[in-house]
Every structure is written in C-alpha cells, then in structure tokens.
C-alpha cells in the first residue's frame, strides 16, 4: 500500500510506501488521520539521489532522516495515487498548529540529525555589525574589570578568546539593542500620529465653525425670504386697493364674460350710481381677503378669484410646473375663454394676415404666477431657480391655448366627416 504524503518543511508531496511512515500500519484506505503529523522517512529518490543508484530497502531507511509529514491519501497501487492527483481528487486540508506542536514523536530525529544540525548552524550563521559591536562592548567591560590594556599585554586573538566566555552578556546586549530601536521607532510613530491627530482636530474645529456660520446665514436667508414674500403680498394688496380707489377693480375684465367676471350686488350698484354724481365720491375699498381661504366649497386665490375646492385639492397633487400651470389656467379662465384669447394679445408671426386675439387679463396672470411661486417656494429657496421656473408661465399657457384650439379643430373635422356620411 502507498501513501500520498506532504512534507511540512518544504511543502512537497510524494507517493511513498506506507512502510516509510514510522509506527503506521493502516488496515484500509481510510485508516489515517489527515490532521495528524506523522514521522516519515524520505527515500533516496526524494533526497535527490542519482537515478542510477539502487533504492534502499525499508530496513536501511533508519539511516535516513525523519521528517514531519501529513498523509493526504492511501491507495493499493502507486498508479492509483498518480491518477487521483492528475484528476485533482486529492485535497490538502488545513493543518492546525496544535497537531504540529504536540507531536512528540517527530521531535526525536536521531543522533545523525542532531549532528547535522550542530554542524550546519555555525556555517550558516553570518556575523553582523550588531554582533561585533556587542563583542567590543563586552571586551571593553572586561578590560575595565580586570585592568587589562589592549596595547600592552594582550593581542586581539587573546581578547576574543577571553571574551568568548561572556557570550551570555553579548546576547543580553544584543537583545537590549533591538527593543531600543523598536522603542525609538514606536516613539516616532506615536509622535507622528499625535501630530496628525492635532492637525485633524484643527481641521474639525475649522469645519465646525464654518458649519455654524453657514447655519446662521441659512437662517438669515430664510428670514429674508419670508419677509420678501410677506412684502410681496402686502404690495399686491396695496395695488388692489389703489385699483379699487381709481375705479377699475382688478376683478373687472375687459370683456363681459360670465366665467371670469364678478357682478356687484344690486344694492351696491345703485349706491355707486347715486354717489357717482357727486364730485367728492371715491369708491369704497373692498376688504382685502387672505389667500387660500375656504368659503362655501370655494378657495380664494387672491384679487377676488375663487375656484372649486375639490378641483383645487386635485391641483395640489399635480406633478410638474407645466401641468400645474395649464390646469390652473383652465380653472381660472375656462376652455371657452382660453381658445379665443392669447397671452400677450400680439398676432403670431407664423401666419400672414393673422388677426391678434384679445390678451388675457394681467392681474389673473399675476395670480397664476403667485400660485406657482408659492408651490415652488415649498420645494426650494433658490431665487435664481424660482425666477427661471416662473419665467415659463406664459409659455405653458400658450401651449395650453394651442392644445385647446387643436382639439377643437379635430372635433370639427370629426363632426364634418360624420355629417358627410
């Protein structure tokens, strides 16, 4: 039976007879522990012998060295192991350190192994500057203790011979040099880390002060925006009062359209006609009403313009400025008015001999802008963005008028086609 083993010292795998494993007699192919460290003799071919040299018998392997190895697989024939290796069926498990350290059998390497270890150790050891410095320190200390002088009574060879018994002191000095260098390196790293930490604390304090200043500026900016909005409302109300005093109320449109004008009550109309004959008459200013108040299922948008409450709530959930503006324009003017109006009252340049349509009332356009402004102000406080979005109100209303006219023309075509049939 053959064993596929992995030597721990050089991590090389070989297929060897089970007789190469000391004190190992497997009964089957699974009778081994892959987590155990075995003592294995290496054969001559694994030691780098010449191919012509005859293989040694198992009884002659005692002269060879024992090596720590891990058994990975067992097989009846060597070719079976080779096939398993080629097919990658053999896996190398991880070996815990406890099995390597607690293996007492592997520590007995025999006298020849110990002799080789003692022979190779001095040859493989190279002197270093630290060792020379330590030897010189020991020699100097011995000279001070014994009152010796290198220039008079001793030669360098004798000094080193006398210093050789103090190898323990040399080792202690050498051990003391390494922690000192390590201590200095750690001290430098610690000082560097302290400097970096001090720098980071300064940066953190500077950032904190900047954040506090930004928070104060943002608070002041919010107060200014609120004040500006309040001033705009007061300005609009003042304009309404002035228009009423001049006799042209903002709720009176240029054309008498039922959907966009508010007729005064009969009593007020008679009062106006009676007092208009006197030279000192001024129309009484109408009470200025707050925006977005509810009354009998209506919502007040300002300047005496009321819209349906249910439609207003549906408008608040509308997505996008374009759709919001178009729906609000339909709620204020109605499709019948919009299709016969234009935003500015100027004829289009796309058609020759185009007849200009009456413009939309400016104060109602201002109401549309104010409603859109209140909506945008809830999303952002950037005045540049607000102004940019408000500048598209006329464009949105113009697009809505074009859509209404287009749908009306399509409806007329369908009716004409139906009548022809």
From Swiss-Prot:
GO-annotated biological processes: negative regulation of DNA-templated transcription
Alphabetical keyword list: Acetylation, Coiled coil, DNA-binding, Isopeptide bond, Repressor, Transcription, Transcription regulation, Ubl conjugation
GO molecular function term, any single one: DNA binding
Please indicate if the UniProt record lists Lyase as a keyword.
no
Q: Does the keyword Transcription apply?
A: yes
Q: Which Gene3D superfamilies match?
A: BEN domain
UniProt modified residues of type N6-acetyllysine: 133
One Pfam match, given by its short name, reads: BEN
Q: Where is this cross-link: Glycyl lysine isopeptide (Lys-Gly) (interchain with G-Cter in SUMO2)?
A: 258
Q: Which residues form a coiled coil?
A: 180-243
Q: Which domain of life is it from?
A: Eukaryota
Report domain BEN positions. 302-408
CC terms in the record's Gene Ontology section: Golgi apparatus
Domain commentary? The BEN domain mediates DNA-binding.
Function of the protein: Acts as a transcriptional repressor.
Task: Write down what this protein is called.
Answer: BEN domain-containing protein 5
Provenance organism: Mus musculus (Mouse)
């Amino acid at each position: 039976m053959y064993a596929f083993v992995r030597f721990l010292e050089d991590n090389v795998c070989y297929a060897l007879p089970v007789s190469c494993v000391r004190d190992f007699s497997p009964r089957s192919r699974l009778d081994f522990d892959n987590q155990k460290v075995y003592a294995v003799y290496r054969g001559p071919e694994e030691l780098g012998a010449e191919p012509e040299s005859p293989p040694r018998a198992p009884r002659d392997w005692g002269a060879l060295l024992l090596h720590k190895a891990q058994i990975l697989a067992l097989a009846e024939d060597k070719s079976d192991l080779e096939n398993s290796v080629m097919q990658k069926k053999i896996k190398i498990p991880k070996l815990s350190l406890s099995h390597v350290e607690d293996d007492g059998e592997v520590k007995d390497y025999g006298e020849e192994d110990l002799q080789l270890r003692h022979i190779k150790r001095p040859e493989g050891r190279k002197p270093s500057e630290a060792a020379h410095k330590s030897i010189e320190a020991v020699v100097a200390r011995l000279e001070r203790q014994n009152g010796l002088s290198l220039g008079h009574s001793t030669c360098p060879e004798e000094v080193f011979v006398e210093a050789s018994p103090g190898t323990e002191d040399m080792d202690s000095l050498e051990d003391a040099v390494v922690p000192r260098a390590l201590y200095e390196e750690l001290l430098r790293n610690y000082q560097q880390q302290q400097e970096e930490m001090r720098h980071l604390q300064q940066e953190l304090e500077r950032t904190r002060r900047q954040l506090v200043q930004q928070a104060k500026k943002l608070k002041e900016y919010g107060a200014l925006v609120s004040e500006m909005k309040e001033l705009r409302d007061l300005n609009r109300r003042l304009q309404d009062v002035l228009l009423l005093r001049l006799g042209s109320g903002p709720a009176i449109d240029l054309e008498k359209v039922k959907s966009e004008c508010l007729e005064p009550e009969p009593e007020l109309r008679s009062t106006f006609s009676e007092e208009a004959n006197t030279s000192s008459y001024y129309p009484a200013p109408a009470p200025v009403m707050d925006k977005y108040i509810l009354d009998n299922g209506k919502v007040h948008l300002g300047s005496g313009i009321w819209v349906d409450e249910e439609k207003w709530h549906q408008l608040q959930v509308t997505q996008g400025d374009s759709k919001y503006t178009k729906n609000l324009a339909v709620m204020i003017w109605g499709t019948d008015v919009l299709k016969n109006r234009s935003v500015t009252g100027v004829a289009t340049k796309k058609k020759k001999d185009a007849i200009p349509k009456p413009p939309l009332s400016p104060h109602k356009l201002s109401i549309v802008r104010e409603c859109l402004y209140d909506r945008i102000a809830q999303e952002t406080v950037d005045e540049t963005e607000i102004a940019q979005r408000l500048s598209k109100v006329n464009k949105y209303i113009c697009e809505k008028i074009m859509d209404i006219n287009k749908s009306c023309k399509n409806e007329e075509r369908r009716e004409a086609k139906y009548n022809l049939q």
